[in-house]
């Protein structure tokens, strides 16, 4: 498949226009579909669907706190897991625009304490494209049993024990360590914590007041609790996420994520070069990966033969799931945040897209889930 480019993001009117669907009818169908998932799959979380710059459905479902019977609200805060990687990639590009970072420079320039073979062979480009050869996870004991915050120095120490599984640049292989390292670089060149940089460059300027970086000493007041399904019902399933620096430690609301999406896809926040880097993906074998986003084709609404460009990322971690999908040509954004696992979040997200475009979910959406 040819590379999908950011140039498509400016092409909102390609091909025949899809048939219009009344907004109130769409909202009713979206809500009914979500309630079916609540009943049959135990979905709990918050959802926002926006079309042509207007929110057409925004609602919360299920419980945020099983013990206290506190319901999820539209302003509930959820851990977003690997959707954090998209924020890290954007922050790197902001620093590139400022002349602070060079995507092709060896990491040793920024992290002199990184093991020599890693520092000399890895670049930010390879990290963001998931082509470093680093393993998927940091350390199972750290990820599952840490009761106190893991420091950046400790994360770097653990990365220095990692072995490469292939020559850097040889192929695509998804790894959380890539984005741990990118966050460490951000901290090194700014002299500030990852949380402080995100606040200064994204959360503050975009007025994302319900978003931030979670730590043991910073658990947000409106956060939903994460749960795992079991034979006897659901049970709390959470962990200290400080180990997930730059790859899974952000919490947010659906409203804040929509604000962020509007800035990203509105063509005004980042330079054209940055958008090209972020939103140019590869082949399916390369994970459709750009910089912190997956870019792949999608099927549009009735009467439109051309396939559109989907920009997406999701997350899955203890008790939480997330998806942010932006269907470029249809100017459609679907955001799903959940606080129970396992749950078929990708299927639900694609089905919500179908309904918003006036298509009944079925074989088309199932095929896109598998793509």
Predicted regions and their residues:
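Catalytic loop of the DD-peptidase/beta-lactamase superfamily, centered on the K-T-G motif
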Residues: 17-59, 146, 187-192, 196-200, ...
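Catalytic-site signature segments of enzymes, centered on catalytic residues
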Residues: 60, 75, 138-220, 242-258
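Extracytoplasmic/secreted proteins, especially bacterial periplasmic and envelope-associated proteins
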Residues: 25, 29-33, 82, 87, ...
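Active-site helix/loop module of the DD-peptidase/beta-lactamase fold
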Residues: 79-83, 95-139, 161-163, 184, ...
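Short linear capping/connector segments at secondary-structure termini
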Residues: 19, 63-65, 106-113, 140-145, ...
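Bacterial N-terminal signal peptides
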Residues: 2-12
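Acidic-glycine-rich active-site phosphate/pyrophosphate-binding loop
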Residues: 60-68, 153-157, 226-233
């Amino acid at each position: 498949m040819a590379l999908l480019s950011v140039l498509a993001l400016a092409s909102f009117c390609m091909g025949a226009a899809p048939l219009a669907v009344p907004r109130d009818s769409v909202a009713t169908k979206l809500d009914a579909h979500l309630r079916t998932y609540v009943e049959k799959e135990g979905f709990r979380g918050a959802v926002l669907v926006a079309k042509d710059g207007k929110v057409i459905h925004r609602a919360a479902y299920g419980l945020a706190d099983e013990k206290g019977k506190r319901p999820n609200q539209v302003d509930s805060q959820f851990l977003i897991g690997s959707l954090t990687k998209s924020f890290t990639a954007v922050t790197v590009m902001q620093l590139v625009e400022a002349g602070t970072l060079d995507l092709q420079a060896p990491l040793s320039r920024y992290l002199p304490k990184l093991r020599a073979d890693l520092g000399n062979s890895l670049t930010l480009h390879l990290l963001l494209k998931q082509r470093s050869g680093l393993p998927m996870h940091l350390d199972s004991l750290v990820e599952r049993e840490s009761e106190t915050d893991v420091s950046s120095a400790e994360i770097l120490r653990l990365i220095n024990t990692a072995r490469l599984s292939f020559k850097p640049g040889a192929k695509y292989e998804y790894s959380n360590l890539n984005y741990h390292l990118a966050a460490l670089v951000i901290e090194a060149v700014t002299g500030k914590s990852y949380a402080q940089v995100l606040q200064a460059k994204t959360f503050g300027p975009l007025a994302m007041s319900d978003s931030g970086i979670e730590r043991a000493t910073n658990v947000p007041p409106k956060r939903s609790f994460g749960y795992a399904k079991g034979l006897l019902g659901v049970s709390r399933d959470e962990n200290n996420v400080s180990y997930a620096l730059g790859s899974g430690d952000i919490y947010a609301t659906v409203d804040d994520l929509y604000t962020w999406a509007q800035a990203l896809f509105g063509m005004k926040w980042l330079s054209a070069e940055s958008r090209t880097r972020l939103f140019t993906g590869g082949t399916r074998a390369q994970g459709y990966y750009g910089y912190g986003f997956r870019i792949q084709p999608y099927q549009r609404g009735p009467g439109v033969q051309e396939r559109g460009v989907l920009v997406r990322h999701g997350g899955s971690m203890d008790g939480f799931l997330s998806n942010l999908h932006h269907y470029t040509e249809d100017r459609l954004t679907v955001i799903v945040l959940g606080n129970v696992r396992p749950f078929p979040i990708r299927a639900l997200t694609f089905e919500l897209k179908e309904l918003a475009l006036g298509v009944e979910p079925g074989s088309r959406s199932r095929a896109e889930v598998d793509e």
